[in-house]
């Protein structure tokens, strides 16, 4: 036991330095008056009150709207793909899952730039439409371009946990359902879907949290017109230089994420 304790000590030191200390600093900045040094702590809730202004609440609403839309699309497309993959032979499943994860090996920034080339007014898609005699369509800097970028970047995080649940499912339950006279639809809704819910909830949690907290995709595909909560935090730290307000927003986002994760965990237990 002592040997294992010694092995874990370097990790604890690393976690304290790169996780605990930054969180403490963010908390101190969040509750400190703007312009004051952290070491001369002056308690205030003004940074949190500021976030309740209509301008910033609209950012939360926009972030949740696009996050929910992205999650729904990823679930609608990802579940059938995961189901189809789970029905393939085991070797084919490994290959298909590899193909699903390969895009994640490429830096998100590069993938987003690739979508900019595809969706721009002079991009590949509009060029193909022109060859078909169709007028160019404005796709960049719209909800469409942002959602497309979010869906394509985060789809694997929906497919993989669902596939894991489906592939580990005890097939005897499905056979028992058929033996009891259930048709394919009843078997899916009463057996397959319910047994795959843990994977679905994990996928929903990952895609939603990534969607509302990212800032690269909305910034590039939205042309700076789409201020989501991730972009707001980035702008406060990098552009505005208001670390106090940026830290307060970061804490609010962390609390929202914890609440969402708790709800997902409760739903998983209920199922």
Explain the meaning of each model-derived region:
Residues 2, 6-10, 18, 28-32, ...:
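C-terminal transmembrane helix and the adjacent membrane-cytosol boundary/short C-terminal tail
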Residues 20-54, 119, 223, 271:
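Short membrane-interfacial helix/loop motifs at transmembrane-helix boundaries
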Residues 24-26, 34, 158-161, 199-234:
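Non-cytoplasmic
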Residues 54-87:
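Transmembrane alpha-helix signature in integral membrane proteins
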Residues 81-118, 174-175, 188, 197-198:
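Cytoplasmic-entry segments and transmembrane alpha-helices of multi-pass inner-membrane transporters
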